[in-house]
Regions:
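Glycine-rich flexible loops
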Residues: 1-267
Length: 267
């Protein structure tokens, strides 16, 4: 593998993240595995908008330097390590603080509802990992349970991380996560976030499995409300699909409805 090209690609991804406002200043970190125990990563304390390929550091899985450098690997290296150890299929990790995704994480919300078919096909849900102090075992312990069956995570009061086979795919997953959180935020602000019906989610999962984008066991391993009967609190479909839908009213709303109905009969 041409390591110089990998370093240049990491800088390109870092620049995209910076230019799109997915991170600021020295926030976030990016890495790419080029051999089983050889990883190229962004250095600590350097703005992602000002990086150069020669600034990249080369480390082993434990974060020990493999090449001389005046720069150190990010203090959040343990997060990258646990992802690579849990997922042999993963060769790139992108961690950032996208505003909408991080807003969800601060609000205690996961990206748990199937609201866009493209997202079900390409990303799946993004669980919310409990808060853990950055750069400590607390954080790695918080994210580890979700790594096997999910390709992106929200981290409470921290940010988001996405991982894939390539740097481009990992960035795409992070960008998709942020875009979906933004759409979800807009829908919730408008007062209604409809979800894709369970049977449609099943079809999307089947397509994803056929394309090799998801292992069959990952379907039931998803911790979000993507499994049948658990897909959010509302489901869309043809008008007839909602005839038997239960509707909850407060006592005051029920009284008002009955009063208005009585007025109709008095006219």
């Amino acid at each position: 593998m041409d390591e110089q090209k990998v370093k240049e690609e990491i800088v390109e991804i870092a620049t995209r993240c910076y230019d799109r406002g997915l991170l600021v200043a020295g926030d976030g970190n990016i890495s790419a595995r080029v051999a089983p125990n050889r990883i190229i990563a962004t250095p600590s304390g350097v703005s992602k908008g000002w990086m150069r390929p020669e600034m990249m550091v080369v480390v082993d899985i434990e974060g020990n330097p493999l090449e001389p450098s005046d720069l150190r690997v990010s203090s959040e290296w343990p997060m990258h390590r646990v992802i690579y150890q849990a997922r042999p299929d993963i060769n790139a990790v992108v961690h950032a603080h996208p505003p909408y995704a991080t807003g969800f994480a601060v609000a205690g919300l996961s990206l748990s509802k199937a609201i866009l078919s493209e997202v079900v096909l390409t990303l799946g849900c993004a669980p919310l990992a409990a808060y853990g102090t950055p750069s400590t075992r607390e954080l790695t312990d918080a994210i580890e349970p979700y790594l096997e069956f999910h390709d992106a995570l929200l981290m409470a009061n921290h940010g988001a991380v996405a991982y894939a086979d390539t740097l481009e795919m990992a960035f795409n997953k992070l960008e998709t996560l942020e875009h979906t959180c933004k759409i979800s935020f807009i829908a919730r602000s408008l007062g209604n976030e409809n979800t894709i019906p369970d049977r449609a989610v099943e079809k999307l999962f089947e397509i994803r499995e056929r394309n090799g984008a998801m292992r069959p066991e990952a379907r039931t391993g998803q911790v979000c409300s993507y499994t049948p009967g658990e897909n959010g609190d509302r489901a869309t479909g043809r008008p007839g699909d909602r005839e038997n839908e239960q509707v909850a009213l407060t006592r005051a709303e029920l009284v008002e409805l009955l009063v208005e109905s009585a007025k109709l009969f008095q006219r």
